[in-house]
Curated annotation (Swiss-Prot):
Example of a GO MF term: 3 iron, 4 sulfur cluster binding
Intracellular or extracellular location(s): Cytoplasm
UniProt similarity note: Belongs to the archaeal Rpo3/eukaryotic RPB3 RNA polymerase subunit family.
Residue positions binding [3Fe-4S] cluster: 206, 209, 212
Record protein name field: DNA-directed RNA polymerase subunit Rpo3
Gene Ontology, cellular component aspect: cytoplasm; DNA-directed RNA polymerase complex
PROSITE patterns, alphabetized: RNA_POL_D_30KD
Source species: Methanosphaera stadtmanae (strain ATCC 43021 / DSM 3091 / JCM 11832 / MCB-3)
InterPro entries: DNA-dir_RNA_pol_30-40kDasu_CS, DNA-dir_RNA_pol_insert, DNA-dir_RNA_pol_RpoA/D/Rpb3, RBP11-like, RNAP_Rpo3/Rpb3/RPAC1, RNApol_insert_sf, Rpo3/RPB3_RNA_Pol_subunit
Cytoplasm recorded as keyword: yes
Free-text cofactor note: Binds 1 [3Fe-4S] cluster.
Cofactor(s) essential for the protein: [3Fe-4S] cluster
UniProt function note: DNA-dependent RNA polymerase (RNAP) catalyzes the transcription of DNA into RNA using the four ribonucleoside triphosphates as substrates.
Database matches in Pfam families: RNA_pol_A_bac, RNA_pol_L
Length: 270
């Protein structure tokens, strides 16, 4: 298997994978979507809420705030030895804000959540939680714990995770006429003209829409659009709780563990 990185930052990664089949790459995709543990607010104790927003809506909005996840310091509640929650499986956030007299309104943001662990905090500071009017106050405690995307979308580490087959375009340059027309009709600007010859530019931008192939019917099917066997373009974006390649590493570890469990089961049955 060969991997070539095209883009990489703290929230997005694009890379080309070669030498695997779609069953393997789709398994990695599904694990990234629903089996990567992340921190999210699960329980909310509301002590005071003068805002017009219902308690249930407020709690729901808190649950969807992405939280920086430290998998080395926390474990899933089901794997913790405690019975009621402890510092190894839960993180507490306190929120106490008031719109003082003389102010028309005040927006409470995610940055106003105060964590008892400095390393665990909302990924973004400017997520609006609730608007308070003059004299209104909100006070609550929010408890975050690890969970899986298969249980609730708030625990999904990835916002986008998918792949496409690596495109392939074959051009019979001796048959192609009206080169400018092909360039203009390509919606992804893949085709270019170099030295009076129609060539493929950035092939990875191709969506295999086959517009050029249909257009080439007038030129005796001079263009054929297909895809490479066992070669894919994989894209992954996270909500910031984990970095993309951390998600991929964990996904591969999970897949390896599943394979080991099957091997051990088979060996025990023999």
């Amino acid at each position: 298997m060969n991997i070539e990185i095209r883009e990489k930052d703290d929230e997005r990664a694009v890379f080309v994978v070669e030498g695997v089949d779609d069953t393997f790459i789709n398994t990695i995709r599904r694990i990234c979507l629903v089996e990567i543990p992340t921190l999210a607010i699960e329980d909310v104790n509301i002590y005071k809420n003068d805002a017009k927003m219902f308690d249930e809506v407020l709690a729901h909005r808190l649950g969807l705030i992405p939280i920086v996840t430290d998998l080395d310091s926390y474990v899933m509640p089901s794997e913790c030895d405690c019975e009621s929650g402890c510092q190894h499986c839960r993180v507490s956030f306190l929120l106490k804000e008031k719109c003082e007299e003389g102010n028309d309104s005040k927006i409470v943001y995610s940055k106003d959540l105060k964590s008892d662990d400095p390393a665990v905090k909302p990924v973004y500071d400017t997520i609006p939680i609730v608007r308070l009017r003059e004299g209104e106050e909100v006070e609550l405690e929010a408890i975050a714990e690890l969970g899986l995307g298969s249980e609730h979308a708030k625990w999904q580490a990835t916002t986008t995770c998918g792949y496409k087959y690596y495109p392939k375009i074959e051009i019979d340059t001796e048959k192609v006429n009206d080169l400018e027309e092909y360039v203009e009709e390509c919606p992804r600007n893949v085709l270019q003209i170099e030295d009076d010859t129609l060539v493929v530019g950035n092939i990875e931008n191709c969506s295999t829409c086959r517009t050029c192939q249909r257009l080439s019917e007038k030129d005796d099917n001079a263009i054929v659009v297909d895809f490479e066997e066992s070669k894919y373009i994989f894209k992954i974006e996270t909500d910031g709780s984990l970095k993309p390649f951390d998600v991929l590493t964990i996904a591969c570890d999970i897949l390896s563990e599943k394979a080991d469990n099957i091997i051990n089961f088979v060996n025990e049955e023999e």
